[in-house]
From Swiss-Prot:
Its job: NAD-binding protein involved in the addition of a carboxymethylaminomethyl (cmnm) group at the wobble position (U34) of certain tRNAs, forming tRNA-cmnm(5)s(2)U34.
Native organism: Xanthomonas axonopodis pv. citri (strain 306)
Entry similarity comment: Belongs to the MnmG family.
The protein's name in its UniProt record: tRNA uridine 5-carboxymethylaminomethyl modification enzyme MnmG
Any single GO CC term annotated in Swiss-Prot or TrEMBL for this entry: cytosol
Protein backbone atom coordinates (compact mmCIF):
# COMPACT_ATOMS: atom_id res chain seq x y z
CA UNK A 1 0.00 0.00 0.00
CA UNK A 2 1.36 3.44 -0.88
CA UNK A 3 2.57 5.76 1.84
CA UNK A 4 -0.10 8.30 0.83
CA UNK A 5 -2.80 5.83 1.91
CA UNK A 6 -1.74 6.38 5.51
CA UNK A 7 -1.09 10.15 5.41
CA UNK A 8 -3.80 12.79 5.52
CA UNK A 9 -4.24 16.41 6.55
CA UNK A 10 -7.22 15.67 8.80
CA UNK A 11 -8.56 12.44 10.30
CA UNK A 12 -12.13 12.30 11.63
CA UNK A 13 -13.03 9.50 14.04
CA UNK A 14 -16.71 8.55 13.90
CA UNK A 15 -19.34 8.64 11.16
CA UNK A 16 -22.34 10.03 13.04
CA UNK A 17 -23.85 13.48 12.71
CA UNK A 18 -20.80 15.29 14.12
CA UNK A 19 -18.33 13.12 12.23
CA UNK A 20 -19.93 13.43 8.81
CA UNK A 21 -20.25 17.22 9.05
CA UNK A 22 -16.66 17.44 10.34
CA UNK A 23 -15.28 15.35 7.49
CA UNK A 24 -17.32 17.21 4.87
CA UNK A 25 -16.31 20.64 6.21
CA UNK A 26 -12.65 19.70 6.37
CA UNK A 27 -12.70 18.40 2.81
CA UNK A 28 -14.62 21.44 1.49
CA UNK A 29 -12.05 23.69 3.17
CA UNK A 30 -9.35 22.02 1.07
CA UNK A 31 -7.85 19.47 3.46
CA UNK A 32 -7.20 15.88 2.42
CA UNK A 33 -9.51 14.15 4.87
CA UNK A 34 -9.98 10.59 6.14
CA UNK A 35 -13.21 9.55 7.85
CA UNK A 36 -12.75 6.47 10.02
CA UNK A 37 -15.89 4.63 11.11
CA UNK A 38 -16.36 1.26 12.80
CA UNK A 39 -19.09 0.44 10.25
CA UNK A 40 -19.62 2.17 6.92
CA UNK A 41 -23.24 0.99 6.87
CA UNK A 42 -24.07 3.22 9.86
CA UNK A 43 -22.64 6.47 8.46
CA UNK A 44 -25.32 9.11 9.05
CA UNK A 45 -27.50 6.76 11.12
CA UNK A 46 -30.17 8.28 13.37
CA UNK A 47 -29.56 6.39 16.61
CA UNK A 48 -32.60 7.70 18.46
CA UNK A 49 -35.51 9.86 17.32
CA UNK A 50 -36.00 9.94 13.52
CA UNK A 51 -36.49 13.70 13.39
CA UNK A 52 -34.48 16.79 12.49
CA UNK A 53 -35.02 20.33 13.75
CA UNK A 54 -37.31 21.85 16.36
CA UNK A 55 -37.05 24.82 18.72
CA UNK A 56 -33.43 26.01 18.74
CA UNK A 57 -32.37 22.88 16.86
CA UNK A 58 -33.89 24.00 13.57
CA UNK A 59 -31.92 27.22 13.89
CA UNK A 60 -28.71 25.18 14.15
CA UNK A 61 -29.66 23.12 11.08
CA UNK A 62 -30.23 26.29 9.06
CA UNK A 63 -26.81 27.58 10.18
CA UNK A 64 -25.14 24.31 9.20
CA UNK A 65 -26.84 24.62 5.82
CA UNK A 66 -25.80 28.26 5.41
CA UNK A 67 -22.20 27.10 5.88
CA UNK A 68 -22.57 24.41 3.21
CA UNK A 69 -23.31 21.48 5.53
CA UNK A 70 -25.28 18.34 4.71
CA UNK A 71 -27.93 17.95 7.42
CA UNK A 72 -30.63 20.20 5.92
CA UNK A 73 -30.21 18.75 2.43
CA UNK A 74 -30.55 15.21 3.79
CA UNK A 75 -33.60 16.24 5.81
CA UNK A 76 -35.29 17.62 2.68
CA UNK A 77 -34.72 14.28 0.94
CA UNK A 78 -35.94 12.23 3.91
CA UNK A 79 -38.62 14.35 5.63
CA UNK A 80 -41.97 12.53 5.65
CA UNK A 81 -43.87 14.96 7.90
CA UNK A 82 -43.09 18.68 8.17
CA UNK A 83 -44.15 21.30 10.69
CA UNK A 84 -43.24 24.90 11.50
CA UNK A 85 -43.26 25.13 15.28
CA UNK A 86 -44.31 28.43 16.91
CA UNK A 87 -45.77 29.48 13.55
CA UNK A 88 -48.13 31.95 15.25
CA UNK A 89 -45.31 33.61 17.18
CA UNK A 90 -42.59 36.02 16.13
CA UNK A 91 -39.92 35.06 13.57
CA UNK A 92 -37.19 34.72 16.22
CA UNK A 93 -38.72 31.57 17.70
CA UNK A 94 -40.28 29.94 14.64
CA UNK A 95 -38.61 26.62 13.99
CA UNK A 96 -38.74 23.98 11.27
CA UNK A 97 -39.02 20.30 12.21
CA UNK A 98 -39.34 17.20 10.07
CA UNK A 99 -40.07 13.61 10.85
CA UNK A 100 -37.53 11.71 8.77
CA UNK A 101 -37.44 8.30 7.15
CA UNK A 102 -34.28 7.07 8.85
CA UNK A 103 -33.25 4.89 5.89
CA UNK A 104 -33.68 7.72 3.40
CA UNK A 105 -31.76 10.06 5.70
CA UNK A 106 -28.84 7.67 6.13
CA UNK A 107 -28.72 7.07 2.37
CA UNK A 108 -28.74 10.80 1.66
CA UNK A 109 -25.85 11.47 4.05
CA UNK A 110 -23.82 8.59 2.67
CA UNK A 111 -24.34 9.80 -0.91
CA UNK A 112 -23.21 13.31 0.05
CA UNK A 113 -20.14 11.91 1.84
CA UNK A 114 -19.17 9.65 -1.05
CA UNK A 115 -19.57 12.48 -3.58
CA UNK A 116 -17.32 14.90 -1.66
CA UNK A 117 -13.88 15.53 -3.23
CA UNK A 118 -10.88 15.33 -0.86
CA UNK A 119 -12.74 12.88 1.41
CA UNK A 120 -11.90 9.19 1.88
CA UNK A 121 -13.90 6.77 4.04
CA UNK A 122 -12.29 3.73 5.67
CA UNK A 123 -13.91 1.17 7.97
CA UNK A 124 -11.83 0.77 11.12
CA UNK A 125 -12.28 1.24 14.84
CA UNK A 126 -9.68 3.50 16.46
CA UNK A 127 -7.92 2.29 19.61
CA UNK A 128 -5.45 5.11 20.30
CA UNK A 129 -4.13 8.50 19.28
CA UNK A 130 -0.54 9.15 18.25
CA UNK A 131 0.63 12.03 20.45
CA UNK A 132 3.94 13.87 20.11
CA UNK A 133 5.36 14.91 23.47
CA UNK A 134 7.63 17.87 22.87
CA UNK A 135 10.29 18.74 25.42
CA UNK A 136 9.78 22.48 25.08
CA UNK A 137 6.41 22.66 23.35
CA UNK A 138 2.87 21.52 24.04
CA UNK A 139 1.76 18.01 23.16
CA UNK A 140 0.36 17.65 19.65
CA UNK A 141 -1.53 14.94 17.81
CA UNK A 142 0.16 13.13 14.93
CA UNK A 143 -2.38 10.49 13.96
CA UNK A 144 -4.31 7.42 15.11
CA UNK A 145 -3.86 3.68 15.62
CA UNK A 146 -6.70 1.38 14.60
CA UNK A 147 -7.93 -1.81 16.22
CA UNK A 148 -6.02 -3.83 13.60
CA UNK A 149 -2.78 -1.92 14.19
CA UNK A 150 -2.90 0.38 11.16
CA UNK A 151 -1.28 3.76 11.80
CA UNK A 152 -2.80 6.73 9.97
CA UNK A 153 -0.91 10.01 10.24
CA UNK A 154 -2.34 13.55 10.27
CA UNK A 155 -1.50 16.81 12.07
CA UNK A 156 -5.22 17.34 12.84
CA UNK A 157 -7.62 14.78 14.32
CA UNK A 158 -11.31 15.31 15.09
CA UNK A 159 -12.83 12.93 17.65
CA UNK A 160 -16.61 12.45 17.33
CA UNK A 161 -17.21 9.23 19.25
CA UNK A 162 -20.79 9.92 20.37
CA UNK A 163 -21.92 7.46 23.05
CA UNK A 164 -19.25 4.89 22.15
CA UNK A 165 -16.52 5.81 24.68
CA UNK A 166 -16.86 3.15 27.40
CA UNK A 167 -20.54 2.93 26.47
CA UNK A 168 -22.70 0.77 28.73
CA UNK A 169 -26.33 -0.17 28.02
CA UNK A 170 -28.86 -0.72 30.81
CA UNK A 171 -32.17 -2.61 30.54
CA UNK A 172 -33.39 -3.19 34.07
CA UNK A 173 -30.64 -4.86 36.09
CA UNK A 174 -29.03 -6.13 32.90
CA UNK A 175 -26.06 -4.11 31.70
CA UNK A 176 -23.46 -4.68 29.03
CA UNK A 177 -20.82 -2.80 27.06
CA UNK A 178 -22.03 -1.23 23.80
CA UNK A 179 -21.77 1.98 21.80
CA UNK A 180 -25.48 1.73 21.03
CA UNK A 181 -27.70 -1.33 20.75
CA UNK A 182 -26.11 -3.65 18.20
CA UNK A 183 -22.75 -1.85 18.04
CA UNK A 184 -19.58 -2.46 20.08
CA UNK A 185 -18.16 0.28 22.33
CA UNK A 186 -14.82 2.05 21.95
CA UNK A 187 -13.47 0.60 25.19
CA UNK A 188 -9.76 0.63 24.39
CA UNK A 189 -9.85 4.19 23.03
CA UNK A 190 -11.76 5.32 26.13
CA UNK A 191 -9.11 3.79 28.39
CA UNK A 192 -6.29 5.47 26.44
CA UNK A 193 -8.02 8.84 26.61
CA UNK A 194 -8.36 8.51 30.38
CA UNK A 195 -4.55 8.35 30.49
CA UNK A 196 -4.39 11.78 28.83
CA UNK A 197 -4.75 15.13 30.65
CA UNK A 198 -8.51 15.43 30.07
CA UNK A 199 -11.26 15.92 32.66
CA UNK A 200 -13.66 13.04 31.97
CA UNK A 201 -17.02 12.19 33.52
CA UNK A 202 -20.13 10.16 32.66
CA UNK A 203 -23.46 11.13 31.13
CA UNK A 204 -26.55 9.13 30.29
CA UNK A 205 -29.15 9.16 27.55
CA UNK A 206 -31.99 6.84 26.66
CA UNK A 207 -34.38 5.72 23.97
CA UNK A 208 -37.91 4.27 23.95
CA UNK A 209 -38.94 0.80 22.83
CA UNK A 210 -39.86 0.61 19.14
CA UNK A 211 -43.32 -0.67 18.23
CA UNK A 212 -44.79 -2.51 15.24
CA UNK A 213 -47.21 0.11 13.95
CA UNK A 214 -49.51 -2.57 12.52
CA UNK A 215 -50.42 -3.62 16.07
CA UNK A 216 -51.74 -0.20 17.14
CA UNK A 217 -55.28 1.17 17.20
CA UNK A 218 -55.04 4.60 15.57
CA UNK A 219 -58.78 5.10 15.91
CA UNK A 220 -58.39 6.21 19.55
CA UNK A 221 -55.49 8.56 18.77
CA UNK A 222 -55.47 12.14 17.47
CA UNK A 223 -54.05 12.51 13.97
CA UNK A 224 -51.28 15.08 13.51
CA UNK A 225 -50.89 15.87 9.81
CA UNK A 226 -48.00 17.95 8.55
CA UNK A 227 -48.17 21.57 7.43
CA UNK A 228 -49.65 22.71 4.15
CA UNK A 229 -47.85 24.30 2.39
CA UNK A 230 -44.78 22.26 3.25
CA UNK A 231 -41.65 24.05 4.49
CA UNK A 232 -38.12 23.10 3.44
CA UNK A 233 -35.02 22.86 5.61
CA UNK A 234 -32.24 23.81 3.20
CA UNK A 235 -31.86 27.21 1.58
CA UNK A 236 -31.11 25.13 -1.54
CA UNK A 237 -34.14 22.89 -1.04
CA UNK A 238 -37.53 22.76 -2.69
CA UNK A 239 -40.77 21.01 -1.81
CA UNK A 240 -40.34 18.61 -4.74
CA UNK A 241 -37.32 17.15 -2.89
CA UNK A 242 -39.61 15.72 -0.21
CA UNK A 243 -40.76 12.09 -0.33
CA UNK A 244 -44.39 11.04 0.22
CA UNK A 245 -45.90 12.67 3.32
CA UNK A 246 -47.59 10.84 6.22
CA UNK A 247 -49.19 11.82 9.52
CA UNK A 248 -47.95 11.37 13.05
CA UNK A 249 -50.39 10.57 15.87
CA UNK A 250 -50.86 11.66 19.48
CA UNK A 251 -51.91 9.48 22.41
CA UNK A 252 -51.45 9.48 26.21
CA UNK A 253 -50.29 7.31 29.04
CA UNK A 254 -52.93 6.25 31.57
CA UNK A 255 -53.13 6.01 35.36
CA UNK A 256 -52.55 2.29 34.88
CA UNK A 257 -49.30 3.11 33.05
CA UNK A 258 -48.12 5.20 35.98
CA UNK A 259 -49.08 2.53 38.50
CA UNK A 260 -47.09 -0.08 36.58
CA UNK A 261 -44.06 2.22 36.58
CA UNK A 262 -44.33 3.15 40.27
CA UNK A 263 -44.55 -0.51 41.26
CA UNK A 264 -41.37 -1.28 39.30
CA UNK A 265 -39.15 1.63 40.33
CA UNK A 266 -37.08 -0.66 42.57
CA UNK A 267 -36.09 -2.51 39.39
CA UNK A 268 -35.14 0.66 37.51
CA UNK A 269 -31.39 1.23 37.05
CA UNK A 270 -32.12 4.96 37.35
CA UNK A 271 -33.39 4.60 40.90
CA UNK A 272 -31.31 1.67 42.14
CA UNK A 273 -28.02 3.56 41.81
CA UNK A 274 -26.89 1.34 38.94
CA UNK A 275 -26.68 4.32 36.56
CA UNK A 276 -24.28 7.06 37.67
CA UNK A 277 -24.41 9.35 34.64
CA UNK A 278 -26.80 12.30 34.54
CA UNK A 279 -29.46 12.25 31.82
CA UNK A 280 -30.93 15.05 29.68
CA UNK A 281 -33.18 17.40 31.64
CA UNK A 282 -35.41 18.16 28.65
CA UNK A 283 -35.85 14.58 27.47
CA UNK A 284 -36.54 12.64 30.69
CA UNK A 285 -37.44 8.97 30.82
CA UNK A 286 -41.08 8.02 31.41
CA UNK A 287 -40.19 6.72 34.89
CA UNK A 288 -38.56 10.07 35.66
CA UNK A 289 -41.67 11.94 34.49
CA UNK A 290 -43.98 9.78 36.60
CA UNK A 291 -41.87 10.44 39.72
CA UNK A 292 -41.24 14.16 39.13
CA UNK A 293 -44.79 14.97 38.07
CA UNK A 294 -46.70 12.69 40.40
CA UNK A 295 -49.82 14.85 40.21
CA UNK A 296 -50.27 14.26 36.46
CA UNK A 297 -52.66 11.50 35.39
CA UNK A 298 -51.31 11.26 31.83
CA UNK A 299 -48.35 12.21 29.66
CA UNK A 300 -48.53 12.93 25.94
CA UNK A 301 -46.91 10.52 23.50
CA UNK A 302 -46.16 11.32 19.86
CA UNK A 303 -46.51 8.24 17.66
CA UNK A 304 -43.95 8.82 14.92
CA UNK A 305 -43.30 6.60 11.87
CA UNK A 306 -39.72 5.42 11.40
CA UNK A 307 -40.05 5.37 7.63
CA UNK A 308 -42.26 4.89 4.59
CA UNK A 309 -41.34 1.28 3.88
CA UNK A 310 -41.13 -0.07 7.44
CA UNK A 311 -43.77 -0.85 10.07
CA UNK A 312 -41.84 0.37 13.11
CA UNK A 313 -42.93 3.48 14.96
CA UNK A 314 -41.09 5.61 17.50
CA UNK A 315 -43.23 6.39 20.60
CA UNK A 316 -41.75 9.77 21.48
CA UNK A 317 -42.21 10.35 25.21
CA UNK A 318 -41.62 6.94 26.78
CA UNK A 319 -37.84 6.64 26.85
CA UNK A 320 -37.12 3.99 29.48
CA UNK A 321 -34.54 1.61 30.93
CA UNK A 322 -37.03 -0.47 32.95
CA UNK A 323 -36.87 -4.28 32.61
CA UNK A 324 -38.42 -5.63 29.43
CA UNK A 325 -41.41 -7.24 31.14
CA UNK A 326 -42.26 -3.86 32.68
CA UNK A 327 -41.77 -2.14 29.32
CA UNK A 328 -44.24 -4.54 27.71
CA UNK A 329 -46.82 -3.95 30.44
CA UNK A 330 -46.53 -0.16 30.41
CA UNK A 331 -46.63 0.01 26.61
CA UNK A 332 -49.84 -2.06 26.47
CA UNK A 333 -51.49 0.21 29.05
CA UNK A 334 -51.24 3.24 26.72
CA UNK A 335 -54.33 4.35 24.76
CA UNK A 336 -54.31 2.49 21.43
CA UNK A 337 -51.41 0.23 22.42
CA UNK A 338 -53.34 -2.66 24.00
CA UNK A 339 -52.08 -5.17 21.42
CA UNK A 340 -48.73 -3.48 20.76
CA UNK A 341 -45.79 -5.64 19.72
CA UNK A 342 -42.39 -4.29 20.82
CA UNK A 343 -39.77 -4.79 18.11
CA UNK A 344 -36.81 -3.39 20.10
CA UNK A 345 -36.57 -2.69 23.83
CA UNK A 346 -35.95 0.75 25.24
CA UNK A 347 -32.67 1.26 27.06
CA UNK A 348 -30.40 3.76 28.75
CA UNK A 349 -26.75 4.17 27.80
CA UNK A 350 -23.93 5.66 29.87
CA UNK A 351 -20.82 7.02 28.18
CA UNK A 352 -17.70 9.11 28.77
CA UNK A 353 -17.70 12.82 28.00
CA UNK A 354 -15.04 15.51 28.32
CA UNK A 355 -15.37 18.72 30.30
CA UNK A 356 -15.81 21.20 27.42
CA UNK A 357 -14.01 23.88 29.42
CA UNK A 358 -10.90 22.08 28.23
CA UNK A 359 -11.61 23.30 24.69
CA UNK A 360 -10.83 26.47 22.78
CA UNK A 361 -13.61 28.23 20.87
CA UNK A 362 -12.35 26.41 17.77
CA UNK A 363 -13.12 23.09 19.58
CA UNK A 364 -9.40 22.29 19.64
CA UNK A 365 -8.36 20.82 22.97
CA UNK A 366 -6.16 22.99 25.16
CA UNK A 367 -4.13 19.97 26.26
CA UNK A 368 -3.20 18.52 22.86
CA UNK A 369 -2.56 20.68 19.80
CA UNK A 370 -4.36 19.67 16.62
CA UNK A 371 -6.86 17.48 18.48
CA UNK A 372 -10.50 18.58 18.19
CA UNK A 373 -13.59 17.25 19.98
CA UNK A 374 -17.15 17.49 18.66
CA UNK A 375 -20.60 16.16 19.50
CA UNK A 376 -21.89 14.24 22.49
CA UNK A 377 -18.40 13.79 23.90
CA UNK A 378 -18.53 17.54 24.68
CA UNK A 379 -21.62 17.10 26.84
CA UNK A 380 -24.36 17.92 24.34
CA UNK A 381 -27.45 15.96 23.33
CA UNK A 382 -29.12 15.92 19.93
CA UNK A 383 -28.19 15.37 16.30
CA UNK A 384 -28.29 19.08 15.49
CA UNK A 385 -25.99 20.17 18.33
CA UNK A 386 -23.54 17.43 17.32
CA UNK A 387 -23.61 18.28 13.62
CA UNK A 388 -23.03 21.99 14.26
CA UNK A 389 -20.00 21.24 16.43
CA UNK A 390 -18.73 18.78 13.84
CA UNK A 391 -18.80 21.37 11.09
CA UNK A 392 -16.91 23.89 13.24
CA UNK A 393 -14.33 21.34 14.39
CA UNK A 394 -13.76 20.01 10.87
CA UNK A 395 -13.31 23.51 9.46
CA UNK A 396 -10.84 24.48 12.16
CA UNK A 397 -8.97 21.19 11.87
CA UNK A 398 -8.37 22.02 8.21
CA UNK A 399 -7.38 25.61 9.00
CA UNK A 400 -4.96 24.33 11.67
CA UNK A 401 -3.13 22.29 9.02
CA UNK A 402 -3.19 25.18 6.56
CA UNK A 403 -1.71 27.62 9.09
CA UNK A 404 -4.83 29.79 9.00
CA UNK A 405 -6.46 31.40 12.05
CA UNK A 406 -9.27 29.45 13.70
CA UNK A 407 -12.84 30.70 13.30
CA UNK A 408 -15.76 30.56 15.68
CA UNK A 409 -18.91 32.70 15.52
CA UNK A 410 -19.75 35.09 18.34
CA UNK A 411 -22.92 34.78 20.41
CA UNK A 412 -24.57 37.54 18.37
CA UNK A 413 -23.66 35.87 15.07
CA UNK A 414 -25.03 32.35 15.40
CA UNK A 415 -26.65 29.80 17.68
CA UNK A 416 -23.48 27.82 17.04
CA UNK A 417 -21.64 30.68 18.77
CA UNK A 418 -24.02 30.49 21.73
CA UNK A 419 -23.59 26.72 21.93
CA UNK A 420 -19.80 26.79 21.91
CA UNK A 421 -19.50 29.76 24.26
CA UNK A 422 -21.87 28.15 26.79
CA UNK A 423 -19.91 24.90 26.71
CA UNK A 424 -16.37 26.25 26.93
CA UNK A 425 -17.23 28.92 29.50
CA UNK A 426 -19.70 27.20 31.83
CA UNK A 427 -19.09 23.53 31.10
CA UNK A 428 -22.02 21.21 31.76
CA UNK A 429 -23.05 18.59 34.28
CA UNK A 430 -25.97 17.29 32.19
CA UNK A 431 -26.56 16.82 28.46
CA UNK A 432 -26.80 20.30 26.90
CA UNK A 433 -29.70 21.01 24.54
CA UNK A 434 -30.12 24.16 22.46
CA UNK A 435 -33.15 26.42 22.99
CA UNK A 436 -33.89 29.86 21.55
CA UNK A 437 -34.05 31.12 25.16
CA UNK A 438 -30.28 30.56 25.50
CA UNK A 439 -29.57 33.35 23.00
CA UNK A 440 -29.70 36.94 24.22
CA UNK A 441 -29.83 38.27 20.63
CA UNK A 442 -32.35 35.83 19.19
CA UNK A 443 -34.17 38.39 17.04
CA UNK A 444 -30.92 38.65 15.07
CA UNK A 445 -30.47 34.86 15.04
CA UNK A 446 -33.52 33.71 13.15
CA UNK A 447 -33.87 30.63 10.96
CA UNK A 448 -34.81 32.76 7.97
CA UNK A 449 -31.62 34.87 7.98
CA UNK A 450 -29.03 32.18 8.73
CA UNK A 451 -27.74 32.48 5.17
CA UNK A 452 -27.45 36.27 5.43
CA UNK A 453 -25.47 35.85 8.64
CA UNK A 454 -23.14 33.02 7.64
CA UNK A 455 -23.00 32.17 3.93
CA UNK A 456 -20.60 35.01 3.13
CA UNK A 457 -18.30 33.88 5.94
CA UNK A 458 -18.53 30.29 4.73
CA UNK A 459 -17.72 31.33 1.19
CA UNK A 460 -14.58 33.14 2.33
CA UNK A 461 -13.37 29.99 4.11
CA UNK A 462 -14.09 27.61 1.23
CA UNK A 463 -17.17 25.95 2.72
CA UNK A 464 -19.73 27.27 0.23
CA UNK A 465 -19.74 26.02 -3.36
CA UNK A 466 -20.53 28.04 -6.48
CA UNK A 467 -24.14 26.85 -6.78
CA UNK A 468 -25.02 27.85 -3.23
CA UNK A 469 -23.21 31.16 -3.56
CA UNK A 470 -25.05 32.00 -6.77
CA UNK A 471 -28.42 31.16 -5.18
CA UNK A 472 -27.58 33.25 -2.11
CA UNK A 473 -26.37 36.23 -4.16
CA UNK A 474 -29.51 36.13 -6.32
CA UNK A 475 -31.72 36.05 -3.23
CA UNK A 476 -29.93 39.00 -1.61
CA UNK A 477 -30.17 40.99 -4.82
CA UNK A 478 -33.90 40.22 -5.08
CA UNK A 479 -34.47 41.37 -1.49
CA UNK A 480 -32.64 44.63 -2.13
CA UNK A 481 -34.45 45.18 -5.43
CA UNK A 482 -37.92 44.60 -3.95
CA UNK A 483 -37.16 46.76 -0.91
CA UNK A 484 -35.99 49.57 -3.19
CA UNK A 485 -39.10 49.22 -5.39
CA UNK A 486 -41.49 49.53 -2.46
CA UNK A 487 -39.52 52.30 -0.76
CA UNK A 488 -39.92 54.45 -3.88
CA UNK A 489 -43.73 54.32 -3.68
CA UNK A 490 -45.87 56.67 -1.59
CA UNK A 491 -49.55 56.59 -0.76
CA UNK A 492 -51.52 59.73 0.14
CA UNK A 493 -55.20 60.28 0.98
CA UNK A 494 -55.74 61.79 -2.45
CA UNK A 495 -53.51 59.84 -4.86
CA UNK A 496 -54.43 56.72 -6.83
CA UNK A 497 -52.27 54.40 -4.72
CA UNK A 498 -53.89 55.62 -1.51
CA UNK A 499 -57.34 54.92 -2.94
CA UNK A 500 -56.22 51.45 -4.13
CA UNK A 501 -54.93 50.61 -0.64
CA UNK A 502 -58.26 51.68 0.87
CA UNK A 503 -60.31 49.71 -1.69
CA UNK A 504 -58.21 46.51 -1.66
CA UNK A 505 -57.34 46.33 2.03
CA UNK A 506 -59.88 48.50 3.81
CA UNK A 507 -57.01 50.55 5.23
CA UNK A 508 -57.33 54.32 5.37
CA UNK A 509 -54.22 56.32 4.49
CA UNK A 510 -54.59 59.52 6.51
CA UNK A 511 -51.29 61.12 5.52
CA UNK A 512 -48.44 60.65 3.07
CA UNK A 513 -47.06 57.19 3.83
CA UNK A 514 -44.23 55.18 2.34
CA UNK A 515 -45.39 51.76 1.18
CA UNK A 516 -42.78 50.03 3.34
CA UNK A 517 -44.23 51.75 6.40
CA UNK A 518 -47.58 50.14 5.64
CA UNK A 519 -45.97 46.74 6.31
CA UNK A 520 -45.19 47.91 9.85
CA UNK A 521 -48.90 47.94 10.65
CA UNK A 522 -49.82 44.84 12.72
CA UNK A 523 -52.74 43.90 10.47
CA UNK A 524 -50.73 44.06 7.23
CA UNK A 525 -48.18 41.70 5.72
CA UNK A 526 -46.20 41.69 2.50
CA UNK A 527 -48.69 39.18 1.04
CA UNK A 528 -51.75 41.30 1.87
CA UNK A 529 -50.07 44.41 0.49
CA UNK A 530 -49.53 42.63 -2.82
CA UNK A 531 -53.32 42.47 -3.26
CA UNK A 532 -53.14 46.18 -4.15
CA UNK A 533 -53.10 46.23 -8.00
CA UNK A 534 -50.32 48.80 -8.35
CA UNK A 535 -48.10 46.91 -5.87
CA UNK A 536 -48.77 43.29 -6.81
CA UNK A 537 -48.14 40.60 -7.60
CA UNK A 538 -44.73 41.10 -5.97
CA UNK A 539 -41.94 38.52 -5.81
CA UNK A 540 -42.79 34.84 -6.21
CA UNK A 541 -39.93 33.64 -3.97
CA UNK A 542 -41.37 33.18 -0.46
CA UNK A 543 -37.92 33.53 1.14
CA UNK A 544 -37.41 36.92 -0.51
CA UNK A 545 -40.86 38.14 0.52
CA UNK A 546 -40.22 36.99 4.09
CA UNK A 547 -36.93 38.90 4.30
CA UNK A 548 -38.51 42.09 2.98
CA UNK A 549 -41.35 41.86 5.50
CA UNK A 550 -39.24 41.02 8.56
CA UNK A 551 -36.60 43.67 7.85
CA UNK A 552 -39.33 46.32 7.72
CA UNK A 553 -41.79 45.12 10.36
CA UNK A 554 -39.11 44.55 13.01
CA UNK A 555 -36.73 47.35 11.98
CA UNK A 556 -36.97 49.22 15.30
CA UNK A 557 -36.34 46.13 17.40
CA UNK A 558 -33.48 45.01 15.16
CA UNK A 559 -31.82 48.44 15.31
CA UNK A 560 -32.00 48.48 19.11
CA UNK A 561 -30.54 45.00 19.33
CA UNK A 562 -27.72 45.98 16.97
CA UNK A 563 -26.95 48.94 19.24
CA UNK A 564 -26.86 46.58 22.24
CA UNK A 565 -24.47 44.30 20.39
CA UNK A 566 -22.20 47.21 19.44
CA UNK A 567 -21.96 48.28 23.09
CA UNK A 568 -21.26 44.72 24.19
CA UNK A 569 -18.60 44.26 21.51
CA UNK A 570 -16.37 47.11 22.72
CA UNK A 571 -14.36 44.71 24.85
CA UNK A 572 -15.91 41.35 23.86
CA UNK A 573 -13.12 40.35 21.50
CA UNK A 574 -10.16 41.77 23.46
CA UNK A 575 -7.84 38.73 23.45
CA UNK A 576 -6.27 37.20 26.54
CA UNK A 577 -2.90 35.62 25.62
CA UNK A 578 -2.40 31.87 26.01
CA UNK A 579 -0.61 31.13 29.26
CA UNK A 580 -1.60 34.48 30.77
CA UNK A 581 -0.50 34.73 34.44
CA UNK A 582 -3.59 35.81 36.38
CA UNK A 583 -1.58 35.94 39.60
CA UNK A 584 0.33 38.88 38.10
CA UNK A 585 -2.81 41.04 38.03
CA UNK A 586 -2.73 43.04 41.25
CA UNK A 587 -6.09 43.20 43.02
CA UNK A 588 -7.57 39.95 41.68
CA UNK A 589 -8.90 37.80 44.51
CA UNK A 590 -7.69 34.22 44.86
CA UNK A 591 -11.24 33.03 44.07
CA UNK A 592 -11.36 34.99 40.81
CA UNK A 593 -7.86 33.82 39.87
CA UNK A 594 -8.94 30.21 40.37
CA UNK A 595 -12.04 30.66 38.22
CA UNK A 596 -9.97 32.21 35.43
CA UNK A 597 -7.30 29.53 35.68
CA UNK A 598 -9.91 26.77 35.44
CA UNK A 599 -11.64 28.15 32.34
CA UNK A 600 -8.64 29.87 30.70
CA UNK A 601 -10.84 32.28 28.65
CA UNK A 602 -9.56 33.31 25.24
CA UNK A 603 -11.03 36.81 25.32
CA UNK A 604 -12.64 39.30 27.71
CA UNK A 605 -16.17 38.45 26.58
CA UNK A 606 -15.71 34.84 27.62
CA UNK A 607 -14.16 35.93 30.93
CA UNK A 608 -17.19 38.15 31.65
CA UNK A 609 -19.53 35.16 31.35
CA UNK A 610 -17.71 32.98 33.88
CA UNK A 611 -20.10 32.47 36.84
CA UNK A 612 -19.07 34.69 39.75
CA UNK A 613 -16.89 37.01 37.66
CA UNK A 614 -17.21 40.62 38.88
CA UNK A 615 -17.12 43.87 36.86
CA UNK A 616 -14.23 45.01 39.05
CA UNK A 617 -12.20 41.94 38.12
CA UNK A 618 -12.85 42.53 34.41
CA UNK A 619 -11.74 46.16 34.79
CA UNK A 620 -8.49 45.04 36.42
CA UNK A 621 -7.89 42.57 33.60
CA UNK A 622 -8.51 45.22 30.95
CA UNK A 623 -6.12 47.68 32.61
CA UNK A 624 -3.42 45.00 32.88
CA UNK A 625 -3.86 43.87 29.25
CA UNK A 626 -3.76 47.46 27.96
CA UNK A 627 -0.62 48.17 30.00
CA UNK A 628 1.02 45.05 28.55
CA UNK A 629 0.01 46.05 25.02
CA UNK A 630 1.52 49.52 25.41
CA UNK A 631 4.77 48.15 26.79
CA UNK A 632 5.09 45.86 23.75
CA UNK A 633 4.49 48.78 21.38
CA UNK A 634 7.07 50.88 23.20
Amino acid sequence: MSDSFYRYDVIVIGGGHAGTEAALASARAGARTLLLTHNIETVGAMSCNPAIGGIGKGHLVKEIDALGGAMARAADLAGIQWRTLNASKGPAVRATRCQADRNLYRTAIRCIVEAQPNLTVFQAAVDDLIIHHGASEADSVRGVITQTGLRFQAPSVVLTAGTFLAGKIHVGQTQYAAGRMGDPPATTLAARLRERPFAIDRLKTGTPPRIDGRTLDYGVMAEQPGDDPLPVMSFMGQVSDHPRQVSCWITQTTEQTHEIIRNALHRSPLYSGQIEGIGPRYCPSIEDKVVRFAEKTSHQIFVEPEGLEVAEIYPNGISTSLPFDVQLALVRSIHGFANAHITRPGYAIEYDFFDPRGLKASLETKAVGGLFFAGQINGTTGYEEAAAQGLLAGLNAARHVQGLPAWSPRRDEAYLGVLVDDLITHGTTEPYRMFTSRAEYRLQLREDNADARLTGVGRAMGLVDDARWARFAAKQEAVQRETARLSALWATPGNALGREVADALGVTVSRETNVLDLIKRPELTYATLMRVPTLGPGVDDAQVAEQVEISVKYAGYLDRQRDDIARQQRHETTPIPDGFDYASVRGLSIEVQQKLERVRPQHIGQAQRIPGMTPAAISLLLVHLERARRSQVA
